[in-house]
Amino acid sequence: MICPHCAFDNLPGSEQCGNCQADLTQLDRPTAQDRVERSLMEDPVSRLKPQQAVTLPPGATVRQAIQAMLEYDIGALLIVDDAGRLVGIFSERDLLTKVASPNLDHMDRPVSDFMTPNPETVRPTDSLAFGLHKMDGGGYRHLPVLKDGQPLGMISVRDMLRHITSLCKTCFF
């Protein structure tokens, strides 16, 4: 990638010129080929209208977490401290891989024993592609949406697919 300021030949994908330290981040950006790609690259996460976060404190029991997930028909809960800061996420996957056992004593243990601590998050202003990349790279089905460090909501793979499908309906018909 040739620097437009000094003509230095940088490695492809370089963020900064190796010679003059000029910002190169805008030079190697992919261009959208269709409406779906453009939406993923340009639309913010807020476009998905993230569902409101359902939260519990770390001391809530697994039983309470399951009851909340059933009551709100959701696949994941955000675990927040007394100041409202995100400390973890408890998902259906956590329930199946960490809690499920013949030992029912787990039901009254704190959800913090089984949650995924410090989960990956997105901001409402992040691009859909950024969120999708985090989901794909980490194997996540849910991502908390934080604004100023506080949980604002959550997006899911289903939300992404619903958005892409809505764009494709007009692409093919």
Predicted segments with their positions:
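Tandem CBS (Cystathionine beta-synthase) repeat/Bateman regulatory domains
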Residues: 1-173
